Amino acid sequence: MMILVLRLMCGGFWMISYSIAIYKGIKEKSYAMPFFSLCLNISWEMLYFKKVINGGDGGLIWIIIDSIWLILDAGILITYFLYGKKYYPDKLKKYFWGFSIFQLIIAMLIMNEFYTTYPFHAKINAGFFINIVMSM
C-alpha cells in the first residue's frame, strides 16, 4: 500500500510541475525547462514507458502516470518549439530546427544506449540524474 501511495504522490507532484511549466511557457511565451534536459527526459520517459507497457513493474497505475508524463513532456516540447527560437543568437536562428532535432536524436541515442547497456535499477538512477540536470 505504501508503494502505491508513494507512486501516486510522485506521479502527482511531477504532473503538477509539468503543468506549471506548460502554463508558464504559454503565459510568458517561453519554455520552462532547459532543452537538453527536456530531450533527455522525454527520451527516458519513452523508453521507460515502453518497459512499463511491456510488463514492467508498476501495473496500470504506473502506465497511466507515465502516459500523462509523456503527454505533458510533449506539451513542454511544444512550448520550446513555439517560443525557443527567439532565444537563439540572430546568426544561429536559421539552425534552430535542425539543431533542436539533432539534440533530440542525440538524447534518444544516449538514453537508448544507457537503457540497453545497464540493469534496470541503473535506468532508474538515470531518471534521477535527469532530474538533477533539470534542476540546474
Question: Model-found features: residue ranges?
Answer:
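Alpha-helical membrane-protein topology signature
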Residues: M1-M136
